[in-house]
Swiss-Prot record:
Gene3D superfamilies: YaeB-like. InterPro entries: TrmO-like_N, UPF0066_cons_site, YaeB-like, YaeB-like_sf, YaeB_N_sf. This is Probable S-adenosyl-L-methionine-binding protein PYRAB06630. PROSITE patterns: TSAA_1, TSAA_2. The keyword S-adenosyl-L-methionine applies. Residues 9-140 form the TsaA-like domain. It comes from Pyrococcus abyssi (strain GE5 / Orsay). Keywords: S-adenosyl-L-methionine. The keyword S-adenosyl-L-methionine applies. Belongs to the tRNA methyltransferase O family.
Length: 184
């Protein structure tokens, strides 16, 4: 099988949070307890939200629009040794896709009010899935090098190693507009 050189996704919405700069963002949702935000789903995708309010938690899949890829070996947060990027949760990746499990507080039309947000304001949303513990939780897991460091999670914040200050170069603002208005 020959894989395509590029896969192109169109955002289905935008994630809004109180975090305007990467340095303020908790590095995982479990360290962002009770932080509120909203998900604005573009109107042409709002029909896909039918019945989402029946779930207490949802999985947000998004594009790390300000991440800067530096290579396949990274020094992750909470550790001073390099690891393969695929053995980390670092945002700077060959395909900068993020996932977060958040609490769904309420839905009003195409707006979802959420809690436990660890996402930068203005982040492009690629997809939403319901969180189902029977599907998503595994028992008897090993967490590798994180075993010695996971206790640092609650206080850990971005330190600038993975994010670009000039995100317009990486992700043009026009792509954050509703797809029918985007100037592609």
């Amino acid at each position: 099988m020959v894989l395509p050189l590029m896969i192109c996704y169109r955002p289905i919405g935008i994630i809004h949070s109180p975090f305007k700069e990467p340095k303020d963002v908790p590095i995982q949702a479990s360290a962002a307890k009770d932080i509120e935000g909203t998900v604005e789903v573009f109107p042409e995708f709002s029909e896909g939200l039918k019945d989402i309010e029946e779930f207490s938690h949802i999985i947000l899949i998004y594009h790390f629009h300000r991440a800067k890829f530096k290579g396949l070996l990274v020094e992750p947060y909470m550790h001073e040794e390099k690891h393969g990027v695929f053995a980390t949760r670092a945002p700077a990746r060959p395909n900068p896709i993020g996932i977060s499990v958040v609490r769904l507080v309420e839905r009003k039309g195409n707006i979802l009010r959420i809690r436990d947000v660890d996402i930068l304001d203005g982040t492009p949303l690629l997809d939403i899935k319901p969180y189902v513990p029977e599907f998503d939780v595994r028992e008897n897991v090993r967490i590798g090098w994180l075993e010695k460091n996971v206790h640092k999670l609650e206080k850990a914040r971005d330190d600038g190693r993975f994010f670009s200050l000039n995100f317009n170069y990486i992700f043009p603002a026009s792509l954050l507009e509703a797809p029918e208005r985007a100037k592609l």
